[in-house]
């Protein structure tokens, strides 16, 4: 399965059966067969086996676990990577919406850094996610794709607002906004420059 539309995000954000603490986040995923298989696949990233990564399998495993088994921030990180690595504007925007939705729905509850004991670790993980997002955004190309550019920008604006509300590190998001603006489609950039000239 590949995420290509907003409707595909809904099962990922929906609650799961409650655990022993009454939190609707399903079961612990670590050490499950799917979790270990996903970890093994993503360990290839950045290694000599990078070109052998089965991104479709990794994405399917992550979707299945988050939708049907348990909410886990490490699995979320892998899924975000799957959505972002191609430089596809639509899927990149969906990755930002997914992260925003998770912050709203189950970020503070999810394994393995759930509850008060994970309060210091979750911001670090968020920073790791956003730093990688910034790095992968370099591959985006919005030439003749103004709709994709606007989708990414609007999604990022919502994520920035929510990150500020939750006091999460946002430096990479600010840099990402500057990078997106640099990648603004030419016709849109020319219009913005023209408006700026008229205003002066």
Where are these regions (language model features)?
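N-terminal domain-start signal
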Residues: 1-114, 124, 198-200
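Mid-to-C-terminal functional-domain signal that highlights helix-capping/loop sites
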Residues: 110-200
């Amino acid at each position: 399965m590949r995420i290509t539309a907003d409707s595909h995000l809904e099962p990922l954000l929906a609650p799961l059966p409650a655990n022993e603490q009454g939190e609707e986040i399903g079961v612990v995923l670590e050490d499950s067969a799917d979790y270990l298989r996903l970890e093994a696949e993503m360990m290839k990233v950045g290694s000599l086996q990078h070109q052998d990564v089965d991104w479709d399998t990794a994405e399917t495993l992550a979707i299945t676990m988050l939708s049907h088994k348990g909410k886990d921030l490490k699995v979320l990180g892998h899924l975000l990577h799957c959505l972002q690595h191609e430089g596809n504007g639509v899927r990149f925007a969906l990755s930002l919406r997914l992260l925003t939705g998770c912050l709203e729905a189950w970020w503070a509850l999810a394994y393995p850094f759930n509850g008060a004991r994970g309060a210091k670790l979750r911001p670090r993980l968020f920073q790791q996610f956003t730093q990688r997002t910034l790095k992968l955004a370099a591959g985006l190309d919005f030439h003749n794709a103004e709709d994709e550019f606007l989708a990414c920008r609007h999604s990022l604006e919502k994520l920035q607002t929510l990150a500020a509300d939750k006091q999460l590190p946002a430096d990479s998001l600010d840099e990402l906004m500057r990078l997106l603006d640099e990648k603004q489609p030419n016709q849109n950039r020319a219009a913005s420059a023209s408006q700026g000239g008229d205003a002066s």
